[in-house]
From Swiss-Prot:
Source species: Xenopus tropicalis (Western clawed frog)
Xref: PROSITE patterns: HISTONE_H3_2 (PS00959)
Pfam families: Histone
Compositional bias of kind Basic residues: 42-53
Compartment(s) where it occurs, according to its Swiss-Prot or TrEMBL record: Nucleus; Chromosome, Centromere
Region (H3-like): 53-150
UniProt family annotation: Belongs to the histone H3 family.
Domain of life: Eukaryota
Keyword Cytoplasm on entry: no
Summary of subunit composition and partner proteins: Component of centromeric nucleosomes, where DNA is wrapped around a histone octamer core. The octamer contains two molecules each of H2A, H2B, CENPA and H4 assembled in one CENPA-H4 heterotetramer and two H2A-H2B heterodimers. CENPA modulates the DNA-binding characteristics of nucleosomes so that protruding DNA ends have higher flexibility than in nucleosomes containing conventional histone H3.
Main localization category: nucleus
Keywords tagged on the record: Centromere, Chromosome, DNA-binding, Nucleosome core, Nucleus
Gene3D superfamilies, sorted: Histone, subunit A (1.10.20.10)
Designated name of the protein: Histone H3-like centromeric protein A
Length: 150
């Protein structure tokens, strides 16, 4: 073995790529000139960039922190609101304006974002990075009845 070439530091070899045999082609060149064997090269697929674990998650966090659009899709949220309204309105079917649904969705997403921020602070206080259910429960308990939804 060469110096500095340990089994862990050597590059792994890739298996040889199979190359399909060249396709028979008819040449449109003049018959007096011999044509070189034409080889078609397959388009080389560029390998996807590999990120270290956690980098992609941080990129996603930064992307969503910069954006201002709603993160919950409108149709499922609308169905959920109508279902909850049917439950509490004794079977009456209310009609909703689209602006009212958007305002409710905006408020609910702001509430969830703030709850997750507080919950993550609770997990950091416990010297953890992973968010647990108990962190969310603690954040809601600290907020109280009015801010933590009961």
């Amino acid at each position: 073995m060469r110096p500095g070439s340990t089994p862990a530091s050597r590059r792994k070899s890739r298996p040889p790529r199979r190359v399909s045999p060249p396709l028979p082609t008819t040449s449109t060149r003049s018959p007096g000139r011999p044509s070189a064997p034409e080889q078609r090269k397959a388009p080389r697929a560029t390998p996807k960039k590999r990120f270290r674990p956690g980098t992609r998650a941080l990129m996603e966090i930064r992307k969503y922190q910069k954006s201002t659009e709603l993160l919950i899709r409108k149709a499922p949220f609308s169905r959920l609101v109508r279902e909850v309204c049917m439950t509490y309105a004794c079977g009456l079917n209310y009609s909703w304006q689209s602006m009212a649904l958007m305002a409710l969705q905006e408020a609910s997403e702001a509430f969830l974002v703030r709850l997750f921020e507080d919950s993550y602070l609770c997990s950091l206080h416990a010297k953890r990075v992973t968010l647990y259910v108990q962190d969310i429960q603690l954040a809601r308990r600290i907020r109280g009845v009015t801010e933590g939804l009961g």
